[in-house]
UniProtKB/Swiss-Prot annotation:
Enzyme class of the recorded protein, top EC level: transferase
GO process terms (BP): galactose metabolic process
Primary localisation category: cytoplasm
Name of protein: Galactose-1-phosphate uridylyltransferase 2
Similarity annotation: Belongs to the galactose-1-phosphate uridylyltransferase type 2 family.
Catalytic activities: alpha-D-galactose 1-phosphate + UDP-alpha-D-glucose = alpha-D-glucose 1-phosphate + UDP-alpha-D-galactose
PROSITE patterns: GAL_P_UDP_TRANSF_II (PS01163)
Disulfide links within the chain: none
This protein's GO CC annotations: cytoplasm
Organism: Streptococcus pneumoniae serotype 4 (strain ATCC BAA-334 / TIGR4)
């Protein structure tokens, strides 16, 4: 069967198009790919594989230029043919939601995979493994899914005329957007609209997911990130409205925040993170909130966990803790709420529903810098930046490391170095490699060496989280943590 015929057959079987639409669909494909593809045969069977072959044929026919951007734009346009229009997607979602919220979520997730908005083939390239630590198993991922632009495209992106449409990659205006060299193609993108605390919000999946059913809840308006009482209201509303999903927010300050601070949004999904499994190391109750279970989590970062069947109690207590933290200083342990009227304190909040109760984890953050730590006092320090130097955002806070692609090859080089092979180790890894070699001087087994290096990456990630922790895992640090808790006001169990 010809490539075009096979692709169109798939489109008809997996959409609302009918056999009568075959000629129309064929012409839509030819208009995008080029009529020279009409007689091309294929042995492929899967829809996304057929789409990929059509894209390569378009490059061969010079219908599109040979670039990552052009490929992505055409690919999204082709997959838009199997994607219902936004109003239909929303109608279907809410009609199903009325009798089964779980099924509505599952159907939207399946659509977002089927139409290649979620890049399953790319995500499958990621390296993922777990390592033991003093805080339970941590999750390590080396992110290989996002395609890197070639140098010509990077230059082209710098030369392109500035545009503020869409204003950012999280705006509703991305739905159906054609794409350009410095903004991703979104022809096949769909967003579920819903009302939350009196405002319109959107629900979508992340194209390059870091974990199972990784999704984004985004403000319908382009407003900056802000941690406030409303954040807690919204996060708890999300876990109530989207069963089985957690919801969390990046902090709203530089250094301790995520990569996008210009558009308010939360992340969620169906995944149990290491932090969720971490137990309380100290339990207590806050005065005036006796019905809320509370405690400090055994975790490298500084986490207060609140549990209750009352959303209102959780919101009120979380807001009280946030307000106290924003103005709290303890110079004895290098904690300052502000310097020169610049605020340093905020919270990374995570909400979930567990055993019928609502749970909030509040991670205390401080974005101070100093002469000794110019990148951040509570940020990965210089000696671990060869593994992770970027901000510690929501996902890392919860115990899942997102490490750069360079580490795939570099980890293998260090393993080769440990078994005595003549390899060049990156300068920034040399001290680490020498340290591992001194600990394992007689290694000859490459697989064993690789396992040692990967475990060491995990141990370094635990150190990264400890660096980001405001209260250290020492007697002094934990005593200071309790001073803050007492400032909020507690009743000891």
């Amino acid at each position: 069967m010809t490539l075009v015929n096979k692709f169109v057959t798939h489109v008809i079987s997996e959409s609302s198009f009918e056999e009568m639409d075959r000629i129309y669909l064929t012409n839509r494909v030819l208009a995008r790919v080029g009529e020279g593809v009409l007689e091309v045969e294929t042995n492929l069977d899967k829809l996304i594989d057929l789409k990929d072959q059509l894209v390569e044929e378009a490059v061969r026919l010079e219908t599109i230029e040979d670039s990552q951007t052009a490929r992505e734009i055409l690919g999204a346009e082709l997959m838009d043919l199997v994607t219902p229009c936004p109003s239909q997607v929303n109608r279907d979602f809410w009609a199903t939601y009325a009798h089964s919220p779980e099924q509505a979520i599952e159907d939207f997730y399946q659509l977002s995979q089927k139409n290649d908005y979620i890049k399953l083939k790319a995500i499958a390239r990621n390296i993922a493994y777990r390592v033991p630590s003093d805080y339970g198993e941590l999750e390590i991922t080396i992110n290989l899914s996002k395609p890197e632009k070639d140098p010509k495209e990077i230059v082209a992106a710098k030369l392109v005329q500035a545009s503020n449409y869409p204003q950012c990659q999280l705006c509703l205006e991305n739905e159906g957007y054609h794409g350009r060299v410095n903004h991703p193609a979104r022809s096949n993108h769909r967003i579920i609209r819903f009302e939350m605390v009196g405002q319109e919000w959107g629900f979508q999946y992340s194209p390059y997911a870091y974990f199972n059913e990784h999704c984004i809840f985004l403000d319908g308006q382009h407003r900056p990130m802000a941690i406030s009482r409303q954040s807690f209201e919204r996060l708890l509303a999300i876990v109530d409205q989207f069963p089985g999903y957690f919801a969390g927010s990046n902090a709203d300050l530089p250094i301790v925040g995520g990569s996008i601070l210009t558009h308010d949004h939360y992340q969620g999904g169906r995944h149990v993170f290491p932090m969720e499994l971490a137990p309380l190391q100290k339990a207590f109750r806050f005065a005036g909130f006796e019905q809320v279970k509370a405690g400090i989590v055994k975790w490298p970062m500084s986490v207060l966990r609140l549990t209750s069947d009352s959303k209102e109690d959780l919101i009120n207590l979380a807001d009280k803790i946030l307000q106290e933290w924003r103005q709290y200083s303890d110079p004895a342990v290098q904690i300052l709420a502000e310097t020169d009227r610049t605020p340093h304190h905020t919270i990374t909040p995570i909400a979930r529903k567990r055993d019928g109760q609502f749970e909030l984890d509040l991670v205390l953050r401080d974005n101070q810098t100093s002469a000794e730590y110019p990148d951040g006092i509570y940020h990965p320090h210089k000696d671990v930046q060869h593994i992770k130097k970027e901000n510690i955002g929501l996902i890392e806070v919860m115990g899942l490391a997102i490490l750069p692609p360079r580490l795939k090859e570099e980890v293998e080089q260090v393993a080769s170095y440990l078994v005595g092979e003549a390899v060049t180790v990156a300068d920034y890894h040399q001290e680490w490699a020498d340290q591992l070699k001194s600990q394992h001087p007689d290694l000859t087994d490459k697989e064993k060496a690789l396992a040692i290096v990967k475990d060491s990456v995990g141990a370094i990630f635990a150190r990264v989280l400890e660096d980001a922790g405001v209260y250290k895992q020492t007697e002094q640090g934990q005593t200071a943590f309790m001073r803050f808790v007492e400032q909020v006001g507690i009743l000891l169990d």
